[in-house]
Structure formats: C-alpha cells, structure tokens
C-alpha cells in the first residue's frame, strides 16, 4: 500500500513537470494562465479519450518523461505509464521504449554471424519476428524485419537459387517471403530525437558512392554459392556413356573329354557328320543318362589351325567357347558300338519271329485229324452260345 502511494506521488510530480513545460511553451500574448489550465485539462483526460491522441514523432521531452517513468516503475504496466504522457497510449509507449529508448539495444549494423543466424531461424520459424528476436539479444523484431526485407531476403533467394541449380530441382517460389514494406509506421519508428539507426552509403571524394563492406561480403557470398552449385552439379551429373568393366563371370571354359584343352578348327565335313549322328546321340543319352561334352563349337573358332590363329572370338571373351546346339559323338568307337548293337537287336527280333512260326507249323503237323474235328466242333458250339447270350442281353 505504501509503495502504491509512493508511485502515485512520483507520477503526480512528473505531471507537474509536464504542466510546467507546457506552460513555458505558451503563446506570446501573456495569457499564461489560460494555457496552463488547458494543459492541465489535457493531461487529466489523456488516458481516457481517443480524440485527444497524439500521432506523429515523439518529442525530446516525451522521451525523457518515458525514460524516467520506466526507470522508476519498470518496463511494465504501460497503460499506467501512458496516463502521465498526454496523448500517448500504452502500446505507443511500449513500442517507443522497446524499439528506440531501451539502453540495451545494439545500434550497430548487423554482423555476418547475425545474418547467418537470421537466415537459419527464418528457414525454421518463417516470418515470426518476435520469436527470431529472442535468439538475438539486443535486436528488436522490427529491426530484424527491416533488415530482412532490405538485404537478407534477396541474399536468401540467390542462395536458394544456387542450391537448387546444384541439386537440379526447381527454383523455390518467393510467395512464402514477407512482402511487407521496409518503411515502418511513423508511430513506431519516427522520432524527432533521431533515435532510430539509419545506414547511409559511404561517399568517396570523387562524388561516387563506394560499396560498403556488407555489400562486398554479400557479393562474395553469392559468387561462392554459385561456384559451389556449379561444381556440385558437375559432380552429381551422370556420365553420358556407361562403360562396363570386363570381369570374369560364372561361365567356365569347357574342355574335351578325351584330351588337351587346346582349341582346333572345325572342319565342314565333321560338322555335317555330327548333324547326321545327332539322332543316335540323343538315343544314347536317353538310355545311359550321360551328358556328353562336344569337341567343337558352333562358331568355328576352336579347331586347330596351322598358323595357330583364331577365326572368330566368343562374345564372352577369349577364355570361353561357344558350342553347337546339337552335340556330336565323343568318339568314333562309340558310334560303331551303337551301330553294332542296333544290328544285333534287329537280327534277334527276326530270329524270334521265325522260330515261333516254325514251332506252330510243327505242332499242326503232329496233331491227328479226329482231334482237329472235335476241336472245330467245340469251337463252333462255343461261338453259338456266345451269340445267343449277346442277343438276349
């Protein structure tokens, strides 16, 4: 309770100071009392009515009163502080203090580290300038927004273009960026005391504008990103022609059953003879379930040549051999044995049929005539019985 009374007494003293300063700025007609009464009435109604609001730049006296009130009462309860400043609202007092009068503000130009932090934070939070301002002590959200719109947005766009060119993707759309104007409202930033920070270009003695270090660093950064994008594109682009490396596969060179692995030239007569004996070979393979390896290939590249040269190479390499579709006999002896077996089987079948016929003739000559007649009668009677059974059914 006592603290509240002390605050009210301090506010009353500040009001009197404001009234005295207003009376000192009265008309030259000598009607100082009327001016003082008007000022007193104006102070009394400043926090209640909106028709008495003051819009425009803050004066030096208003800045001093606001600084003194914040120093005594703290940076809180802005509506209560605004009652001591005629025509100013609590929001206006808060923005004026946070953006201009706070002694903890950093008024120097943004450093490269701060620029990188702003770009990284904007990629995460977007246009939430109050959240980004919490990451940079001494920088206000309004200052960060103005710096982004004036310098960093174009730099970020150029960086994204270079990155997209390097990755081969489409250029990012600019619709997500903040399109607000770089000029702040007069109530927030304008001041007659010159509180806001304004960067001006350096002018050389010849009268030409010299680029600042910030612009030089931006140009160097853009050139660097472009160079990195081009090199990255060269690294990621696939080669125009794919050249496979030759290597050994699962195929193995197949040697002959009889002998040496040296290739020899295939003769035309041998090829014809192998085609004639292909049917017999298939028969033998089915009988004995054996897999024969042919001695010659179908490309004509594995037969002996007096010069020792090859006429044709395999598609799989010099170590591989392309064989015929119809395999040949592994040896001439096997063909002779097969022929002999076939002739013996034919002779055996002929002998068996002739011996059966001779035996039947001998039995017919030895059988008597009576028995033959009795047998014929029995056969006829049996056939008649069978016919009657069929007709009855």
From Swiss-Prot:
Residues 50-105, 106-156 form the HTH myb-type domain. The gene is MYB1. Residues 1-19, 221-238 have a biased composition (Basic and acidic residues). One of its GO terms (cellular component) is nucleus. Residues 78-101, 129-152 bind DNA. Keywords: DNA-binding, Nucleus, Repeat, Transcription, Transcription regulation. GO terms for molecular function: DNA-binding transcription factor activity; transcription cis-regulatory region binding. Pfam families: Myb_DNA-binding (PF00249). Residues 1-57, 185-274 are annotated as: Disordered. This is Transcription factor MYB1. Induction: Slightly induced by salicylic acid. The keyword Transcription applies. Residues 263-274 have a biased composition (Polar residues).
